[in-house]
Swiss-Prot record:
GO terms for cellular component: cytosol; mitochondrion. Belongs to the phosphoglycerate kinase family. This is Phosphoglycerate kinase 1. GO terms for biological process: gluconeogenesis; glycolytic process. Pathway: Carbohydrate degradation; glycolysis; pyruvate from D-glyceraldehyde 3-phosphate: step 2/5. It holds the Pfam family PGK. PANTHER family: PHOSPHOGLYCERATE KINASE. It is found in: Cytoplasm; Mitochondrion. ATP binds at A213, K218, G237, G311, E342, D374, T375. The gene is PGK1. (2R)-3-phosphoglycerate binds at V23, D24, F25, N26, N38, R39, S62, H63, G65, R66, L121, R122, H168, R169. HAMAP family: Phosphoglyc_kinase. It comes from Rhizopus niveus.
Length: 417
């Protein structure tokens, strides 16, 4: 799967065409009101581009929450239609469903730059292909899925996917719209461009910073990165599994991943064979409990972490080692925070890595990608947007790309040639 060879909205003639855009309007809501409209704001450039380039209609489709394959009022996209209308400065027609004769008729007759938002795709089990009933997974009927996808396909002439955050899901709206031109919107295109730069043609030295809790959860990520990078920083909770297994460092009641510990020797051996330098933390900020109000302590590798205490962040000596490695690098991919940054007392390690990454950008590092999920949350918490090349919008999707997997939503896009 080449990331750099996918059709983009800029490659298409949109004049007098109905354009169906899969957006990600999965915004946080409270009591029917949107609490953060960032995802809607991010989708607007693609919508505006289609309108400015003569599209006869723009039809928007999205999911919201997890309604489990049935209509649930609190997951309706109706409040989102009002927000899109406000931000776009033009009327948005909201339809009470996303498929079926009424929806098909409304979309097929839309003209003069009309904007339509369909109801939540996940109100139908056919979107995800399954639902949970009484705790059991129930699969959607194969014929019903075909019919659902066929109905979506009749709504427009051109399909645009701008929902990178869902690109790792083989859902109907991601892979089942059977139009001849299927292209990436601006958000999707930006994600693909940056990941292509890092994974297909990186400037070197190439560094991966990998945090997170369990080695066993990140095994594919570490394996794939070892084939690509020059250096690897291992931080976060999974560092303790490496430290205890390799050097018998005392880790107190810090996170220890028993299944993951069995993989450590092979990973280190592979790194040596590939000439990849691994940098581990050497000191830690410790806590007597996992809580924001925990008492804090300090421990080094030599002394180890006392019984009853756990490491929740990397210490200053570790941060200095990480910074030195970061400032040497031209391409950096960061997935997984350095510590429990959600608790102020244990946030300085993650902040130090972020500061170093921003510094590296200023000093000429060409491509810096901060993976989605917790790492992106940390970066946004400290206002890093615009200070590094790219903060990914997709947690699961970015992780799967870094693991070397193909993303169904990307594979489904048309290639340029």
């Amino acid at each position: 799967m080449s990331l750099s060879n996918k059709l983009s909205i800029r490659d298409l003639n949109l004049k007098d065409k109905r354009v169906l855009i899969r957006v990600d309007f999965n915004v946080p809501m409270k009591d029917g009101a949107i609490t953060n409209n960032n995802r809607i704001v991010q989708a607007l450039p693609t919508v505006k581009y289609a309108l400015d380039n003569g599209a006869s209609a723009v039809i928007l489709m999205s999911h919201l929450g997890r309604p489990n394959g049935e209509a649930v009022a609190k997951y309706s996209l109706k409040p989102v239609a009002a927000e899109v209308e406000k931000l776009l400065g033009k009327p948005v027609e909201f339809l009470n469903d996303c498929v079926g004769p009424d929806v098909e008729k409304a979309c097929q007759s839309a003209k003069d730059g009309k904007v339509i938002l369909l109801e939540n795709l996940r109100f139908h089990i056919e979107e995800e292909g399954s639902a949970k009933v009484d705790g059991q997974k129930v699969k959607a009927d194969a014929e019903a899925i075909k019919k659902f996808r066929a109905s979506l396909t009749t709504l427009a002439d051109i399909y645009i996917n701008d929902a990178f955050g869902t690109a790792h899901r083989a859902h109907s709206s991601m892979v089942g719209v059977d139009l001849s031109q299927r292209a990436a919107g601006f958000l999707m295109q930006k994600e693909l461009e940056y990941f292509a730069k890092a994974l297909e043609n990186p400037s070197r030295p190439f560094l991966a910073i990998l945090g997170g809790a369990k080695v066993s959860d990140k095994i594919q990520l570490i394996e794939n990165m070892l084939d690509k990078v020059n250096a690897l920083i291992i931080c976060g909770g999974m560092a303790f599994t490496f430290k205890k297994t390799l050097d018998n460092v005392k880790i107190g009641k810090s996170l220890f991943d028993e299944p993951g510990s069995k993989l450590v020797q092979n990973l280190v051996k592979k790194a040596a064979e590939k000439n990849v330098k691994i940098v581990f933390p050497v000191d830690f900020i410790t806590a007597d409990k996992f809580a924001p109000d925990a008492s804090t302590g300090y421990a080094t590798d030599d002394d180890g972490i006392p019984d009853g205490w756990q490491g929740l962040d990397c210490g200053e000596r570790s941060n200095k080692l990480f910074r030195e490695e970061i400032l040497k690098s031209k391409t950096i991919v960061w997935n997984g925070p350095s510590g429990v940054f959600e608790f102020d007392a244990f946030s300085s390690g993650t902040k130090a890595v972020l500061d170093a990454v921003i510094n590296a950008t200023k000093e000429g590092a060409t491509t810096i990608i901060i993976g989605g999920g917790d790492t992106a949350t940390a970066a946004l918490k400290w206002g890093a947007e615009g200070q590094v090349s790219h903060i990914s919008t997709g947690g699961g999707a970015s992780l799967e790309l870094l693991e070397g997997k193909e993303l169904p939503g990307v594979t489904a896009l048309s290639s340029k040639n």
